[in-house]
Amino acid sequence: MKFIQNNREATALLAIVCLFVFPGALDSQYLSVQTLTMVFSSAQILMLLAIGATMVMLTRNIDVSVGSTTGMCAVLLGVMLNAGYSLPVACLATLILGIVAGFFNGVLVAWLKIPAIVATLGTLGLYRGIMLLWTGGKWIEGLPAGLKQLSAPVFLGISAIGWFTLVLALLMAWLLAKTAFGRNFYATGDNLQGARQLGVRTEMVRIMAFSLNGGMAALAGIVFASQIGFIPNQTGTGLEMKAIAACVLGGISLLGGSGTVIGAILGAYFLTQIDSVLVLLRIPAWWNDFIAGLVLLGVLVFDGRLRCALQRNLRRQKYARFISPPTPLQAEAKTHAQQNKNKEVA
C-alpha cells in the first residue's frame, strides 16, 4: 500500500496499460499505435486543463470555472478570426484573456479571502454569460483552415498541438519538481502558515496558480476550436469536473501539497481512454459520465482508505519507541493468565 501511495504515477500508468490490453482481447485491432495516438489526440484538451488544475489543487484550492473560461476563450478566438485578425494575434489575445480570467479568480481567493469554491462558482456563471453575450447564443462557424491545420498530424501521428502539449507537460513537471518556483506551490498547499514563516509569498503563489490555470484553459479553448472546426454555445460545459477528476486519478491530493503534473496527465489520458473503450464495447454515449464518475468514486474511496492506513502506520512507528517490549517473565505470566481464563470459560 505504501508503494501505491508513493508511486501514483506508476499506478495510473498500470491502469492505462490494463485498459489498453483487456479490450484488445475482444478486438485485436484495438491493440495498435493508432489507438494510442487517437486517444492522445482526444485527451489533449483535458490534459491542458489537468495541468492547470494541478497548479491550483497543489495550493489547496479548486477552480470550477475552468470550463466556462475555456468556452469564453474559444469564443474570443472564433470572433477575432471571423473578424479578419490573423491566427497568431487571435491566439495571443485568447491566451491573455485566459490569464486575466484566472488572475481575477486568484484575486478573489488570495486577496479578498473568498473561498475558492464560492469564488469560482460565481465566475463560472460570469464567464459563461460573457460567452453567450458575445455570440448571442449562436454557434461560431466558418473558422479558417489555418486553425484546423494545427491539429493535423505532423510526426508519428501526433499534431503540432499534441507535441506542444507534451513539451508543456514536461516543462511544468520540471518546474514543479526542480525549482524553487515549483516548491512554493507544494509548500503553500502543505502548510500555509509554515510557508509564510519561510518567506513564501503565499498570496502571490495562489494568484499565480489561478493565472496559470486560466492560461491553460485558454490553450484548451484553442485546441478545441482547432479540432472541432466550429464553436458551439455550450463549449467547455462539464470540463471542470473532468479536469479535477483527472488530477485525483493521477494522485493530486484534494488537501493540497502532493502530486505531480505527470500523474495528472496520465489521469486525463485514462479518463479519455474510458470513452474509447465504451465505444468499442458499443455502450451508449450517455453512460460515459456515469462510468467515469463511478471510477472516480472508487479511486476516492480507495485513496481515503489508503491514507488512513498509512496514517495509522505512521502513528504506530512514531510511538513505538515509547512502548517497551514485554520481558520474558511478563510474557510468560500473560500466557498463563490467558490459559487460566480459557479453563474457567470451559
UniProtKB/Swiss-Prot annotation:
Main localization category: membrane
Keyword annotations from UniProtKB, A to Z: Cell inner membrane, Cell membrane, Membrane, Transmembrane, Transmembrane helix, Transport
GO MF term set: transmembrane transporter activity
Keyword Translocase belongs to the record: no
GO cellular component: plasma membrane
Transmembrane segments: 13-33, 38-58, 71-91, 92-112, 114-134, 154-174, 212-232, 248-268, 283-303
Pfam families: BPD_transp_2
Subunit structure: The complex is composed of two ATP-binding proteins (LsrA), two transmembrane proteins (LsrC and LsrD) and a solute-binding protein (LsrB).
NCBIfam families: PRK15432.1
Stated name of the protein: Autoinducer 2 import system permease protein LsrC
Organism: Salmonella paratyphi B (strain ATCC BAA-1250 / SPB7)
Higher taxonomy: Bacteria, Pseudomonadati, Pseudomonadota, Gammaproteobacteria, Enterobacterales
